[in-house]
Design a protein with these regions (language model features):
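Extracytoplasmic/periplasmic, Sec-exported soluble proteins
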Residues: 25-28, 37-41, 57-61, 92, ...
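Short, charge-rich amphipathic alpha-helical segments embedded
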Residues: 58-71
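Short, low-complexity N-terminal intrinsically disordered segments enriched in polar/charged residues
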Residues: 1-42
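Short, well-ordered alpha-helical segments enriched in acidic and aromatic residues
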Residues: 43-58
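Hydrophobic pocket/interface hotspot
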Residues: 36, 48, 65, 118
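Exposed beta-sheet edge and beta->alpha loop/turn motif
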Residues: 86-144
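A short, amphipathic edge element
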Residues: 68-97
């Protein structure tokens, strides 16, 4: 009798854990966009590949992508570690699409604003577009 009760309790707990995991939405578009910016700042090509959709992987598999990016940036180490702070200025989500306007504050006092386009695929957000956004002189970033 006690064994049956313990077995039922274990099954109930297991079911509750599975439901909780299934309902977890994972990182939100804003989190993924900030992680993508930070990965670029660190020239962390492994993370960039993981966060990017096929649109930004240059048709390469993971290994090829990382090797190609490391080769392309081998002499550009000065481009890493420039960000002092990365944040989100604005975001909009509609269904399985999102646009996030990021703001990268640089150590030298400069600011770079980017537009990060994301798509929700297989239960997770992927970066599918990434471009420089207009700054103060050009008006608000697209999608804001």
């Amino acid at each position: 009798m006690v064994t049956a009760i313990v077995a039922i309790l274990v099954l109930v707990v297991l079911f509750a854990v599975i439901v909780a995991i299934a309902k977890d939405p994972g990182p939100q578009p804003e989190d993924v966009a900030v992680a993508y910016e930070v990965a670029w700042d660190k020239l962390d090509f492994e993370s960039l590949y993981t966060l990017a959709g096929s649109e930004l992987r240059d048709g390469l598999d993971r290994h090829q992508f990382i090797v190609a990016k490391k080769a392309a940036y081998a002499e550009q180490r000065a481009l890493s570690g420039l960000a002092d702070r990365v944040g989100v200025d604005d975001s909009a989500t509609a269904g399985n699409a999102a646009i996030v306007a990021t703001r990268v504050e640089l150590h030298d006092g400069g600011v770079v604003c980017n537009r990060v386009d994301l798509a929700r695929r297989n239960g997770r957000w992927e970066v599918v577009g990434y471009r420089l956004a207009p700054t103060d002189a050009g008006g608000p970033p697209p999608g804001s």
